[in-house]
Amino acid sequence: MQFVKTKLTVLIGTCDKYQPLWENFTTCFNKYWRLDTRNIVVGETKPVLGFETILPGTGLCWGERMLEGIENCSDYIFFILDDYFLSDFWEEDLFKKYIEDIEKHNINCLQISPSDYQTYSTERNCPYLQISDFSQYIISMQPSIWRKSYLQQVLLSHYSPWDFELAGTHVLNVNGDPFLQKKWRVYRDGEAPKRYFNAVRKGFVKCPGWEEFKEKENLKDF
């Protein structure tokens, strides 16, 4: 579908230390990603087979490397990390609807996975939950579709992924609209199921459920 292909880029963040995840990530991505899109991995020095790879080198912060990747993306970005192993099918028709709704409702970021700790504001005639300007995790690395210009605005070059969620959220909270609480126009699809398995936690610690997921998907241990 040319509509989605021209508007959406997949951006995957990684680093050399996470190379043991790449084969499993690729296996799951190729199995479950049903869209014809440009798929970019931003790493450090090592290419990821099967993906367009941008390698700024070592010595740069995660945020600086991601911003270089974002420069190469289209207007809308499906932004994930390499420890998110897809676990269910992602279809083109769904993303077409998401992009159409993002444009119709002037959405800056649409989170399309379940999440905890967020609070919401109401908005008439919009099918999604609007995350309050003062919510925890108004910035989240849960799978989301980002407007490119907004992602460039809120992702600072010195951030790590955890800084992006925590410090980035704090910046938006401090600068939010105290009355309407809707300045940032960040939303979540409240009906979206979880379609991925988070393989590791901070510190490269395997997440609970890894053994079961590995067996189900016939993956390799790492």
Residue ranges with predicted function:
Residues 170, 215-222:
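Alpha/propeptide regions of enzymes that mature by internal proteolysis
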Residues 1-76:
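N-terminal anchoring/stem segment of glycosyltransferases
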Residues 88-118:
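Conserved donor-nucleotide/metal-binding helix-loop-beta segment in metal-dependent transferases, i.e.
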Residues 138-212:
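Catalytic core and acceptor-binding pocket of nucleotide-sugar-dependent glycosyltransferases
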Residues 122-136:
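Short, flexible, basic/aromatic active-site loop/helix in glycosyltransferases
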